[in-house]
């Protein structure tokens, strides 16, 4: 089965519609998919009906529309939230997670995921993605692709943030002899494009996995696979340049664009190393890694510049350097703040108010005692990646949940059939 997380704007916005229609045309030629699940977010009932009509128009008959704003799906989300599973935050992570439940409910053995914004999609890419799992019995396959379009390099978060950060971490861990961290970093570096959203899972693996619900979902998924799978494949998704929608830079807004993506990716990576691998993070560690990151990024940018010149690609070195120093460096520092706060904040304040006489009157009324108490209360505080539980755990606690999902999907299918 195939899962496609889909926003209504993928087919209602004129600039996105041609890309989506091309995906449908290509999928109509694929014969080995039992079902194609469109996890539809941010859509009205009318837009859900529009999607159903579009699917029929372009020959997609084996579809399921998982309308997350529909009455049936809202009932399922409420049941899961009432059970304490924390699926109350809309977004791609929650959408995908429910799609995985739908796929399991109707008997999927293998579940693939692709994004709905691939401008250069071709059915052969899907064949490549499924082949290792479907034919060769791998548990997981991940797409590797060439992020070049309009005669320039894309994949900025991977090239300018993740790769140099991983190399900086490897350099630090190698020097300190911490091999367990080096093994994980080497595993992540082995993927040519760690942040691709195109993957296939064997169902027994997928049901044991947790999934992040922020922009760090891809790196979190790879680390989950590292822990829980034995046979992992990386496939060349396309021999042609791969193109999809690109995030705006949003340099002045840490809650949007590339800035937000970068913070989520770094905090997900580092917090996973803290929680699962026992990494100790301090202010010094964050500063040290940031300095090493800047050096490595500078080396890579020089290589990208040389590569672009040799390959006759457009390359704006100044823009790339500005991204590193103005966005990605700050994202690492911000992620470090998340991971070391709040107890380190009190430590800084204690140092400040005990070293300056201007704070005498505050010390006299007990501020130091309050700060020490706050520090003691929060010493063990850690940043946790927003994530789902596993479907294995949900099924264990609610054994009939898959039956309920089948019932809801059946009613939704009847609704879309009657509306023809």
What is each PLM-predicted segment?
Residues 47-106:
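Active-site-proximal specificity loops/subdomain of glycosyltransferases
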Residues 121-203, 207:
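Conserved catalytic core of nucleotide-sugar-dependent glycosyltransferases
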Residues 32-44, 65-69:
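Short beta-strand/loop segment that forms part of the nucleotide-sugar
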Residues 235-256:
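Active-site donor/metal-binding and catalytic loop motifs
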Residues 251-420:
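Terminal low-complexity segments of carbohydrate-biosynthetic enzymes
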Residues 1-26:
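N-proximal low-complexity "stem/linker" segments adjacent to membrane-targeting elements
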Residues 213, 222-240:
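Catalytic donor-sugar/metal-binding loop of nucleotide-sugar-dependent glycosyltransferases
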Residues 107-119:
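Short beta-strand-to-loop acidic/aromatic patch adjacent to the donor-nucleotide binding site
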């Amino acid at each position: 089965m195939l899962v496609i997380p889909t926003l209504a704007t993928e087919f209602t916005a004129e600039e996105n519609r041609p890309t989506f229609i091309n995906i449908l045309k290509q999928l109509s030629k694929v014969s080995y998919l039992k079902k194609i699940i469109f996890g539809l977010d941010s859509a009205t009932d009318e837009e859900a009906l529009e999607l159903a009509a579009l699917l029929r128009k372009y020959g997609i008959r084996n579809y399921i529309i998982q309308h997350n704003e529909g009455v049936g799906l809202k009932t399922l989300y409420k049941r899961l939230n009432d059970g304490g599973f924390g699926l109350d935050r809309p977004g791609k992570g929650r959408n995908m997670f429910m799609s995985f439940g739908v796929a399991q409910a109707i008997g999927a053995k293998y579940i693939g995921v692709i994004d709905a914004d691939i401008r250069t999609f071709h059915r052969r890419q899907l064949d490549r993605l499924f082949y290792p799992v479907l034919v060769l019995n791998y548990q997981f396959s991940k797409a590797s692709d060439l992020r070049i379009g309009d005669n320039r390099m894309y994949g900025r978060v991977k090239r300018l943030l993740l790769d140099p950060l991983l190399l900086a971490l490897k350099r630090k861990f190698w020097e300190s002899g911490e091999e367990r961290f080096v093994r994980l970093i080497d595993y992540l570096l082995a993927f040519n494009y760690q942040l691709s959203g195109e993957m296939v899972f064997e169902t027994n693996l997928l049901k044991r996995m947790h999934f992040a619900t922020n922009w760090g979902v891809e790196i979190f998924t790879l680390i989950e696979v590292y822990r829980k799978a034995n046979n992992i494949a990386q496939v060349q998704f396309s021999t042609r340049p791969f193109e999809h929608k690109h995030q705006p830079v949003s340099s002045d807004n840490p809650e949007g664009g590339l800035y937000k993506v970068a913070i989520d990716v770094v905090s997900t990576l580092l917090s996973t190393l803290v929680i699962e691998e026992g990494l100790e993070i301090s202010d010094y560690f964050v500063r040290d890694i940031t300095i090493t990151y800047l050096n490595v990024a500078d080396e890579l940018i020089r290589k990208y510049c040389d590569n672009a010149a040799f390959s006759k690609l457009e390359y704006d070195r100044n823009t790339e350097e500005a991204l590193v120093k103005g966005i990605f460096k700050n994202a690492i520092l911000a992620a470090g703040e998340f991971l070391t706060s709040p107890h380190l904040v009190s430590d800084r304040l204690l140092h400040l108010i005990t070293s300056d006489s201007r704070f005498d009157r505050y010390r006299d009324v007990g501020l130091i005692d309050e700060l020490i108490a706050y520090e003691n209360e929060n010493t063990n505080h850690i940043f946790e990646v927003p994530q789902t539980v596993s479907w294995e755990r949900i099924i264990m606690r609610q054994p009939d949940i898959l039956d309920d999902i089948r019932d809801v999907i059946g009613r939704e299918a009847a609704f879309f059939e009657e509306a023809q």
